[in-house]
UniProtKB/Swiss-Prot annotation:
Name of this protein: HssA/B-like protein 38
Organism of provenance: Dictyostelium discoideum
InterPro entries: HssA/B-like_chaperone (IPR050533), HssA/B-related (IPR008455)
Pfam families with a match to the protein in the record: Coiled (PF05710)
A Gene Ontology BP annotation from the UniProt entry: sorocarp development
PANTHER family named in the record: HSSA/B-LIKE PROTEIN 1-RELATED-RELATED, HSSA_B-LIKE PROTEIN 1-RELATED
């Protein structure tokens, strides 16, 4: 069972980052970069997890998409999060992977 909540029109004036859509719910992360990682981690953590995802995993580079780094067993994705350093650090901190 997965709950979906989309975040759109997220942009950074300094990097012209495109809008991102992330899925938040029962540990499933899909969408864009480290934001998706944070969303997957925050599935059971509610606002706290969501805050960590957006604050620590916010992608400032518009890099590659996450491949379910948190939700699918810990295979590190290709996110290039500027603040969080990508999916690895975010998932390591949020998910304990």
């Amino acid at each position: 069972m997965t709950l979906f909540s989309s975040i759109s029109s997220i942009s950074n004036p300094m990097t012209s980052s495109k809008s991102s859509i992330s899925s938040f719910g029962s540990g499933t992360s899909m969408g864009s970069n480290s934001i998706a990682c944070g969303g997957g981690c925050g599935g059971s953590g509610g606002i706290l997890g969501l805050g960590l995802g957006l604050g620590l995993g916010l992608d400032l580079t518009g890099g590659s998409r996450s491949r379910g780094a948190c939700g699918n067993g810990g295979n590190s994705g290709n996110g290039n999060g500027g603040m969080g350093g990508g999916n690895g650090p975010c998932c390591g901190g949020c998910c304990g992977i």
